[in-house]
Regions:
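Extracytoplasmic c-type cytochrome modules immediately beyond a signal peptide or single-pass transmembrane anchor
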Residues: 21-152, 161-179
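Short, cysteine/histidine-rich loop/knuckle motifs that typically chelate Zn2+
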Residues: 155
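Bacterial N-terminal signal peptides
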Residues: 10-19
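Bacterial N-terminal signal peptides that target proteins for export
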Residues: 1-11
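Short Cys/His-rich local motifs and their 1-3 flanking residues in nucleic-acid-associated proteins
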Residues: 158
Length: 179
């Protein structure tokens, strides 16, 4: 009984210390105005999850609903979804052309972060991020590549037929408040 109680107390003490270190990290970040490492990591993890969800949705929509060039393109569906997400205040998300031949002129890198991130993605990076201030709050800007993953992509983007396997032809640009 004593051993079990001792282990339980030790576990509670360790949990308390761990929580204390996390709270200290959060508290020190509040004093400096900079986000804590833990907050940045949580936001980074959210970007990765959103990236997986959005890309999986586009592939599934393309696979199940895009059969010829008269069907509504999955990329256009993604852009509509991104607009709704941003309009509702969840986060900023944009589809960006990396190929140099955008399907829509709006889908080009617009600011310094996006232009630099596109260069890095073209050079083979698989993720680019930067912590910035947006509307007086810390935010994580991130960009991930979109390679051609299906033959159906060339129905709307015939120039993708020449893309090297795995090369970025597009990207998703994210802006999330760090909380």
């Amino acid at each position: 009984m004593y051993r079990a109680t001792s282990l339980l107390v030790s576990g509670v003490v360790l949990a308390g210390l761990s929580a204390g270190f996390l709270l200290a990290d959060e508290a020190s970040s509040e004093k400096t105005g900079k986000p804590s490492k833990a907050a940045i990591e949580r936001t980074r993890k959210t970007v990765r999850m959103l990236d997986d969800v959005y890309k999986t949705a586009v592939v599934l929509i393309t696979d199940k609903y895009v059969h010829d060039e008269n069907d509504f393109p999955a990329g256009s569906a993604a852009i509509a979804l991104f607009g709704e997400v941003e309009k509702k205040g969840w986060h900023g998300v944009r589809l960006i052309d990396v190929s140099g031949q955008p399907y829509d002129p709006e889908n080009v890198a617009k600011d310094d972060f996006e232009k630099d991130a596109v260069r890095q993605l073209r050079d083979g990076k698989d993720y680019v991020e930067k912590v910035v201030e947006k509307d007086g709050k810390p935010a994580l800007r991130a960009m991930t590549p979109i390679p051609v993953v299906m033959q159906k992509c060339v129905m709307c983007h015939p120039h993708y037929a020449d893309a090297k396997k795995g090369a970025a032809v597009g990207a998703i640009s994210y802006t999330l408040t760090i909380e």
